[in-house]
Amino acid sequence: MAVDPAFLHALPKVELHLHIEGSLEPEMMVALAERNGLRLPYASVEAVRAAYDFQNLQDFLDLYYQGMAVLRTERDFEDLAMAYFQRAAAQNVLHAEIFFDPQGHTARGVALEAVIAGLTSARKRAEAELGVSSELILSFLRHLSEEEAFATLEEALPHRDQFIGVGLDSSEVGHPPAKFARVFARARAEGLRLVAHAGEEGPPDYVREALDLLAIDRLDHGNRALEDEALIERLIAEGMALTVCPLSNLKLRVVDDLGAHPLKAMLERGLKATINSDDPSYFGGYMLENMAAVAEALALETHHLRTLTANAIDASFASPARKAEMHARLAAVN
């Protein structure tokens, strides 16, 4: 039986895998370029949107880094994040854990302080004005060196109270988690939470490295773990949450169609899967669109969607009190 759209909308949502730079809508890209006196290689908003029709991860990343170049000032980052929070609140997202890529900004001469201050201002406003709580996760670009990641971490540590953890993203193949074992150990010593993208395009061994060498608290993507039975059993035994991104997987050809997506199989095996939007402006949908699309394609029922939300609450880095509050909101939905 199809899930009632009213239930889908009313369902409280928790997003654990959202790149704030990936929420840059074409309209905002054009507006920020104008505000900052920058020339885009596109004649219109429609031309930008047409460029969002890419075929693979690398083509997407090339466009993603080009797009983020319009982000220059503290106000730009605040506006970007507030636009995301407003969309999230409209879809009944209660809590979001947001990646940001400082190296993509500092390499362009943008001060790290401006990035963090703008995002933090938006987070405070979102909680006060919209009731959306959030955390920031500083993400290292894996195509760069570990030395550069160390430098970014050291530069960010004076702002330690503004971000809860570190992550690892960008081009996966050829950049295994092992490359960043020392910087993750340093982050762990600072009391930061640890997450990493692994097993999206990279092999199951990358997931194993993220567990063994990075000692992650949460696994981002993780789809290819399903190719390794021993790894599946380990993830279940350890209660490791996976931040799964269905529309992202479809757009980047990780799956050929959503009917072949492994999300339902993950749930049925007992994996702690969650639904997330990843880079929603590029991949065609925020939390509600991801849930609706995968619910239809995989014939999910309301109990599956409740489980996905409960998993996300449990796997979040929110306080115990906030988690209890969100579980109560979930239980109240009929």
From Swiss-Prot:
<dbReference type="InterPro" id="IPR006330">
    <property type="entry name" value="Ado/ade_deaminase"/>
</dbReference>
<keyword id="KW-0378">Hydrolase</keyword>
<comment type="function">
    <text>Catalyzes the hydrolytic deamination of adenine to hypoxanthine. Plays an important role in the purine salvage pathway and in nitrogen catabolism.</text>
</comment>
<dbReference type="GO" id="GO:0043103">
    <property type="term" value="P:hypoxanthine salvage"/>
</dbReference>
<feature type="site" description="Important for catalytic activity">
    <location>
        <position position="221"/>
    </location>
</feature>
<dbReference type="InterPro" id="IPR028892">
    <property type="entry name" value="ADE"/>
</dbReference>
<dbReference type="Pfam" id="PF00962">
    <property type="entry name" value="A_deaminase"/>
</dbReference>
<dbReference type="InterPro" id="IPR032466">
    <property type="entry name" value="Metal_Hydrolase"/>
</dbReference>
<feature type="binding site">
    <location>
        <position position="279"/>
    </location>
    <ligand>
        <name>substrate</name>
    </ligand>
</feature>
<feature type="active site" description="Proton donor">
    <location>
        <position position="200"/>
    </location>
</feature>
<keyword id="KW-0862">Zinc</keyword>
<dbReference type="GO" id="GO:0005829">
    <property type="term" value="C:cytosol"/>
</dbReference>
<keyword id="KW-0479">Metal-binding</keyword>
<dbReference type="GO" id="GO:0008270">
    <property type="term" value="F:zinc ion binding"/>
</dbReference>
<dbReference type="GO" id="GO:0006146">
    <property type="term" value="P:adenine catabolic process"/>
</dbReference>
<dbReference type="InterPro" id="IPR001365">
    <property type="entry name" value="A_deaminase_dom"/>
</dbReference>
<feature type="binding site">
    <location>
        <position position="19"/>
    </location>
    <ligand>
        <name>Zn(2+)</name>
    </ligand>
</feature>
<feature type="binding site">
    <location>
        <position position="278"/>
    </location>
    <ligand>
        <name>Zn(2+)</name>
    </ligand>
</feature>
<comment type="similarity">
    <text>Belongs to the metallo-dependent hydrolases superfamily. Adenosine and AMP deaminases family. Adenine deaminase type 2 subfamily.</text>
</comment>
<feature type="binding site">
    <location>
        <position position="197"/>
    </location>
    <ligand>
        <name>Zn(2+)</name>
    </ligand>
</feature>
<dbReference type="GO" id="GO:0009117">
    <property type="term" value="P:nucleotide metabolic process"/>
</dbReference>
<dbReference type="GO" id="GO:0000034">
    <property type="term" value="F:adenine deaminase activity"/>
</dbReference>
<feature type="binding site">
    <location>
        <position position="17"/>
    </location>
    <ligand>
        <name>Zn(2+)</name>
    </ligand>
</feature>
<keyword id="KW-0546">Nucleotide metabolism</keyword>
<protein>
    <recommendedName>
        <fullName>Adenine deaminase</fullName>
        <ecNumber>3.5.4.2</ecNumber>
    </recommendedName>
</protein>
